[in-house]
Every structure is written in C-alpha cells, then in structure tokens.
C-alpha cells in the first residue's frame, strides 16, 4: 500500500472478529417484551428445515481459546465436530470467518421508539406489528413459487398497458386503506424500512449496537427482499399473483424524469412531499441542491448522467479482483461491529446514483427531508419502491451482464450469506429470509424487461472529446489552456499533511502509487483502489463530497458537480432519524459520534483513461458539496 504521509491515519476497515462480541460473562438476557419469552444463555428459535420438519435452532456462546473472546454461533452453520471447530478457531482468512460466522441478526423482540425528526417536532416510531418468533418460518422457494415469471417494466412506459396501470393504482389504494393493525398496510410497510434503516432494532446479543442495513454489504439484499414481499402483497390485494412493480429507468434518457404516473394528484401513487421544482425537469444524477447548476441544458445534463452511470457500473467491473463484490455492494458488517465506527462504508451501488435520486425527489418545502430524503420516511412515497426496483436492476445487470470475469459475484463469507431479516408476506405471516437466498432473481420469480443501456456504449473518443471541452485549469491566478501532461506535472507536485477538516475548503494532495506500469495480467487480477478515510459527524443535511483525479480545475464548493473524465466518484449519505428510543443516543460512546468512515473508489479504468498508468503518483482533489461541516479527512491511500 502506498500511503500519504500523515501525522494521524485512522484505519476504519475493522473486519476482524476482535471486537468484544459479548460481555465477559457469557450470558444473554432478553427482557420480557410485548408478550414474548425471556431467555438466558442461549437464544432459541423454532423454525422449519428444508424438509418442513421442526428444527430447534440454537445460538450458542463459545470462546476462542487463543483470545478468550466469546462468540455467538448458529449451530446450523457449524459443520465440524467439536475438536475440528476449536482447531479452526486458530486459523486465518475466510475459513476462520466462516467457522466463526458472526452474521448480523436483528433482535426484533426489542424494537424501540425513535424520534423521526432531529428537532423532535414530529414524533413517530418505526416498529411494525410484533410477532411470535416461535411461529415464524424460514423462507423456502417452494412455498413462494410463481407459476408465471413476473416482468418488471420501465415506469415511463406504463401508459402503454392501461390494465396493468389500473391494477397498480388499485393495489396501492387498497394497501393505503388497510388498518394500522395490518402489517401489510402502506404505513406499516414504510415502517419496515424505517426500523431496519434508522436503528430501531438492536443486533442480537449486542443491546448497545443498533442494526443499520445501509452503508454495508447488507444494503442490496435487504432492499431486494423488501421489494419482493411488497410486490407480493400488492398482487395478493388485487388477486393477481403475477403483478410486477415498475422500475424508474433513470439510467435511460426517456426515464430521467419523475414518471408521469406518479404525478397525477388524484392518484394513490401521488405523494405531496416531493420537490415541486423537479416534476418536469431532467434529473441530475449527481444532485445536491437546486442552487447549483440550474442553468445546465438537457443535452449536457444527459451526457453527464450517462458518464456517471458508466463510471458507477462499468469501471468497477474491469478486473477479476476477489474483493470486487465488496467494492460494489458494500463493506463487511458483522455482529460486534458498530455502525458508528467499525463498518467501513457504502458500496458503489448505494452511493451514486441511488442516494442522489433520493435527494432529487424529496420535498423542497417541508422540513425533515420528507419523504424520499430520509430513511425514516422514504417508504411512505410509492415512488420509493419504483426507484429501488431500478437499484435492484442495477445489481442484476452488474451480476449478469457486466460481471464477465472470474471474481466472486457476492462476498463468500458466511457472515454475509447467513445474515437474515424478518418480513411479513402477502398473507401477513412473518417470515425469516437469508441473504444467501437473494442472489438469483430467476429463482425469486421475476426479471426485468430489457432496455437500452446508453452508458454501456460510450466510446473512448467521446470521453476524450469531453475531456478537451471541460479542461480549463486555473493556474497562477489566470485562466489558461494547458496540455494534459503539463497540467499533470504541476498538480502532482503538491502534498498536504492530514488530518484536515473538509468544512469549506477543497483539499488537493499528491498520493503515491504502490506500483506503476502494471502488466495487463496484474491489472486484471487486482483493482487499484483509492481509499479515503475520514471522521463523519452527525448532520441534518444530505452529505456529499466529490473526488477527482489529476484534475486542474480550480473547484469551489458551490460549483456544480462536474462529471468529467477526471471524476472518480462521490461520498453521499442520506439523513437519519433519531433511533435508539425517543432520540436517546446514550447507547453510543462519545467518541462514536464522529464515526470512522471510508470511501473506496476503483482506479484501474480511470487511470487508463487519464494516461496515468505509468505515473508514480496521482493528484486527488476532494470537493465538499453538502453537510460536510463535521467531516475531517484523516487519510488518503492507494491499495
């Protein structure tokens, strides 16, 4: 690893299982809550095995004999005898993790109230109706088989099938009319997202750690399952089991607007808590606020949108690096990790354009970033599910179309595969679903209608032309035209000392590369990754900063994000609610309020585009855009 010299470098990727997993006394205590049982020493759930037989699934506490650290294990994940298990405790790598599998498990018996808004003016809680774990069944494909494969189609083509559109409106209307006691009702479905995304559930065995499915490798799978059951509920309500959700096709020019079917004010698909300035406007997939870039014409905006999509989808897919799945899907998140400090960060799929679309859609007049701009309220807008249908489509495209190589499509750790969530199905029955069963949309019974992918066909010549049009570096106080080689030479001479606050100033610094002039084989096997470590404090605003490589532009925070050839990516984060019970954050340590976070960006293809593969170093530019007052950059490395 090449490291930028810094007095303080904070490493944030804590994937080793060396955190205190449980109190030193190996005893769990679940207090009597909402009529469910109390347990000590083990957590027992009655489930069904693959043959439909009852199975007493017990989580047991054991200790690593090398470290005396206790771990919570699911017996079904241990395929070794007792002697083999203890021998494996001293091993390293994936076998170590898989033997001591520590997946994230929600403690749904302890759902807590939360303040929805930061100032507490609107109180709400995120707890769906409680259920008895003793009667909860595990998901089995045979019990949710579809006789006809569902086809999700672009929302902007909805008027071509009036029968389907009428069914969609009727299903949403019925869902909204269901009583709050029904877990399938519109508000209760929205609360599912709030509960898993705003810290209402503690992690099983870790009462001081709140579960959060964003900013980790859980993000894609959770939302796929969420839409899966939401879609089945809608079909059940109108007695059409083959009903399929639409997808908001924001990666295609025809879909880069809020779909018309969601703008009819008398429709159940309408939500008043949207940005009224954007109802008929082409989307900006790198959006921050209406104040920046309002004068950009549609053709230029479209070109930037598809270049952003290419950088988000194609650039991370050009090598066979075994860690590629985590780079795209999100960083590891294991039991014992605290989202306030141990979880590294969101994957490419979540950061852009997912987060920007949320912010583009949220209300511009109502406080609290409602509805789409905050985790606690996003599920209240029917457009949310259409948006996430396209996010899910991006995952499918990355897996089935862009994959093409030998790297794993998903992380291979049992910590990831054996994590689970609870949902209500179309019959209002609770069901437990595992991450490992979410990978194949064909088995889940749905697919996406094919649509042109304009971001797949951008040519090198088009990118070079865009670079020439956009390059106007400000050097020596005067605007001059420079050749790319001269600009690169000047830029890479500067190096800054960290840590540095990002509050209002742009950070430009030289970063040494660990290896230059890499062979084709080396680049195929290993992705060069830019790693930006930073402290992230609380913010009431959408958080965003942009990153550029070898760019001579004199950027200012108020400038519109320029999606040019040098653009490497952005860090983004939506607004959270209070969590933790009435906004009580006492379960968090003081030092955790500024959490260690990391942004990882793929460099292989970008360095090729910039003719920088033979350089000893690169220049990194970090531009604050929104909510960065509490961000401190602590380290910039290449690995």
UniProtKB/Swiss-Prot annotation:
It is an enzyme of class 1 (oxidoreductase). Residues 35-58 are annotated as: Disordered. Its cofactor is Cu(2+). There is a cross-link at residues 197-214 (2'-(S-cysteinyl)-histidine (Cys-His)). InterPro entries: Di-copper_centre_dom_sf, Polyphenol_oxidase, Polyphenol_oxidase_C, Polyphenol_oxidase_cen, Tyrosinase/Hemocyanin, Tyrosinase_Cu-bd. It is found in: Plastid, Chloroplast thylakoid lumen. Its EC number is 1.10.3.1. Cu cation B binds at residues 354, 358, 388. Disulfide bonds join 111-127, 126-194. One of its GO terms (biological process) is pigment biosynthetic process. GO terms for molecular function: catechol oxidase activity; metal ion binding. Binds 2 copper ions per subunit. It catalyses: 2 catechol + O2 = 2 1,2-benzoquinone + 2 H2O. Keywords: Chloroplast, Copper, Disulfide bond, Metal-binding, Oxidoreductase, Plastid, Thioether bond, Thylakoid, Transit peptide. Residues 1-101 form a transit peptide. Cu cation A binds at residues 193, 214, 223. GO terms for cellular component: chloroplast thylakoid lumen. Catalyzes the oxidation of mono- and o-diphenols to o-diquinones. Belongs to the tyrosinase family. This is Polyphenol oxidase, chloroplastic. It comes from Spinacia oleracea (Spinach).
């Amino acid at each position: 690893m090449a490291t930028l010299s810094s007095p303080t470098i904070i490493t944030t990727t804590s994937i080793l299982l060396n955190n205190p997993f449980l109190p030193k006394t190996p005893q769990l205590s679940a207090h009597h809550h909402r009529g469910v049982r109390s347990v000590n020493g083990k957590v027992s759930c009655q489930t069904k095995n693959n043959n439909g037989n009852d199975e007493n699934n017990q989580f047991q506490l054991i200790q690593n004999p090398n470290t005396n650290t206790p771990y919570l294990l699911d017996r079904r994940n241990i395929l070794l005898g007792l002697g083999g298990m203890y021998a494996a405790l001293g091993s390293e790598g994936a076998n170590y993790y898989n033997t001591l599998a520590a997946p994230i498990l929600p403690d749904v018996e302890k759902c807590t109230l939360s303040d929805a808004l930061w100032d507490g003016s609107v109180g709400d809680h995120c707890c769906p109706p409680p259920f008895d774990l003793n009667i909860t069944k595990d998901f089995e494909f045979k019990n949710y088989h579809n006789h006809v494969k569902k086809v999700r189609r672009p929302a902007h083509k909805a008027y071509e099938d009036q029968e389907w559109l009428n069914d969609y409106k009727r299903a949403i209307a019925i869902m909204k009319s269901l009583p709050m006691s029904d877990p399938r009702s519109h508000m209760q479905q929205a609360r599912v997202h709030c509960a898993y995304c705003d810290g209402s559930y503690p992690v099983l065995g870790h009462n001081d750690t709140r579960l959060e499915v964003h900013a980790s490798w859980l993000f894609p799978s959770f939302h796929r399952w969420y839409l899966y059951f939401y879609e089945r509920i809608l079909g059940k309500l109108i007695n059409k089991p083959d009903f399929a959700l639409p997808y908001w096709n924001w990666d295609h020019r025809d879909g880069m607007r809020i779909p018309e079917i969601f703008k009819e004010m008398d429709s159940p698909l309408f939500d008043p808590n949207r940005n009224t300035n954007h109802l008929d406007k082409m989307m900006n997939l790198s959006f921050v606020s209406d104040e920046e870039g309002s004068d950009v014409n549609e053709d230029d905006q479209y070109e930037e949108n598809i270049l952003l999509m290419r950088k988000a989808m194609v650039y991370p897919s050009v090598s066979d690096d075994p860690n590629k799945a985590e780079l795209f899907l999100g960083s590891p998140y294991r039991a014992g990790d605290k989202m306030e400090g141990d979880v590294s960060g969101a994957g490419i799929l979540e950061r852009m354009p997912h987060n920007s679309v949320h912010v583009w859609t949220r209300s511009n007049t109502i406080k609290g970033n409602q509805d789409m701009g905050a985790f606690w309220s996003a599920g209240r807008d029917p457009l949310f599910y259409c948006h996430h249908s396209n996010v899910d489509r991006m995952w499918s495209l990355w897996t089935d179309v862009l994959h093409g190589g030998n790297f794993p499509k998903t992380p291979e750790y049992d910590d990831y595969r054996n994590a689970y969530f609870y949902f209500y199905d179309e019959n209002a029955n609770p069901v437990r679903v595992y991450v490992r069963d979410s990978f194949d949309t064909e088995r889940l019974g749905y697919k996406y209608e094919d649509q042109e992918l304009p971001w797949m066909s951008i040519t090198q010549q088009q990118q070079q032309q865009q670079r020439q049009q956009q390059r106007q570096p400000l050097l020596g106080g005067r605007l001059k035209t420079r050749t790319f080689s001269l600009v690169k030479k000047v830029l890479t001479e500067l190096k800054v000392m960290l840590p540095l606050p990002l509050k209002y100033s742009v950070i430009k610094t030289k970063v040494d590369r660990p290896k230059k002039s890499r062979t084709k084989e080396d680049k195929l096997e290993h992705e060069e990754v830019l790693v930006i470590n930073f402290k992230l404090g609380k913010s009431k605003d959408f958080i965003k900063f942009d990153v550029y490589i070898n760019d001579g532009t004199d950027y200012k925070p108020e400038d519109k994000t320029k999606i040019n050839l040098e653009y490497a990516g952005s860090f983004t984060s939506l607004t959270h609610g209070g969590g933790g019970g009435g906004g009580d954050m006492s379960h968090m340590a003081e030092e955790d309020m500024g959490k260690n976070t990391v942004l990882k960006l793929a460099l292989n293809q970008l360095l090729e585009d910039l003719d920088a593969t033979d350089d000893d170093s690169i220049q990194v530019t970090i531009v604050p855009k929104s909510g960065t007052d509490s961000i401190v950059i602590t380290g910039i490395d290449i690995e």
